[in-house]
């Protein structure tokens, strides 16, 4: 299937590693020009070079890529990212609003600073990124926005209280925005990864193992056992789902929360 993304400009937030990097690679493989960003100039530059090398090794065309060091949790970071991406590649047609996620913690006893940081880096950054692109997308009559959240928006995950709360707020914002923008050819969706093999998942499991006094392998085995697919997801599997939501083929899909989780979430809606 041709996703119809050749010549489109994509801005993928928090894309120096993990799911963000996998999404950037998937969109570049479909022919989109891609702006990557991270707080670390070194890491985002290395990610861009990795993507370029992978595409070249596959024998495919390498679209324009740009690596931008930006702190999306700052007041001006989201606008800076979108502006710099547009300056380098052209107006942004596709936004993938990703972030590293707030630190884990139980509901009781989380301090004000933890909540403030969670709000700024998870909800506010995503909302600001969308605000920075939505006007241009609607004016041009085409656009794709995909917010990356978590299956916790469908089924809360113990120990990820701030993440669950803030990502659920992102879902509410995304649904409202999808209602407003659909008439102008802009789709707004949310992709909710389940247990996917990334460094963040490894860190969460390591914390659980330490707290429970058990081995990391025990935690991993228990986590895999409750997934109907019987294994953790791969970043490229998640990225393929996001690329589809960004495609011409998904032009009539908007306001959706799509779990990419191997069947982990048991809810009917």
Language-model segments: what does each one mean?
Residues 155, 231, 243, 254-269:
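Short C-terminal tail/terminal secondary-structure segment
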Residues 96, 182, 187, 253-255:
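Short, small/polar-rich loop/turn modules that mediate ligand/substrate recognition or access, typified
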